[in-house]
Regions:
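Polar/charged low-complexity regulatory segments
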Residues: 92-95
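Acidic, aromatic-enriched beta-alpha/helix-loop junctions
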Residues: 36-80
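Long, highly charged low-complexity segments enriched in Glu/Asp and Lys/Arg with interspersed Ser/Thr
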Residues: 83-90
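Residues that cap or delimit alpha-helices
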Residues: 17, 75-76, 87
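Negatively charged, low-complexity tracts enriched in Asp/Glu with abundant Ser/Thr
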Residues: 1-33
Length: 95
């Protein structure tokens, strides 16, 4: 059985924290916002590079007929590579 084309991306997205967090991929750091809609069947992820101009935006839909990845004005490879390599940073207390 062949895995679903977006199975790795789906698992990586689900593993990321919901809400706003900081993360790193390669030598770049990002502020990331992950929002769930429709009881988690739709995921919106937006990331802005800290101190740079890189930007990531995508929508991911978990449909009955299969998962669908919709990058926003960028390649599917760019958003897939980003999601698969993004490592959230530990949360810092504001105390």
């Amino acid at each position: 059985m062949t895995p679903a084309p977006h199975a790795g991306v789906e698992a990586a997205l689900l593993a990321l924290p919901t809400g706003v967090f900081r993360g790193q991929t390669g030598n770049r750091r990002y502020v990331v916002s992950k929002t769930l809609f429709n009881a988690g069947k739709s995921i919106k992820l937006v990331a802005e590079e800290l101190g740079g101009d890189d930007y990531i935006s995508l929508n991911f839909y978990r449909l009955n007929r299969g998962a669908r990845l919709y990058p926003c004005e960028m390649s599917a490879k760019k958003v897939t590579d980003f999601v698969m390599t993004l490592k959230p940073e530990p949360a810092q207390d504001d105390a």
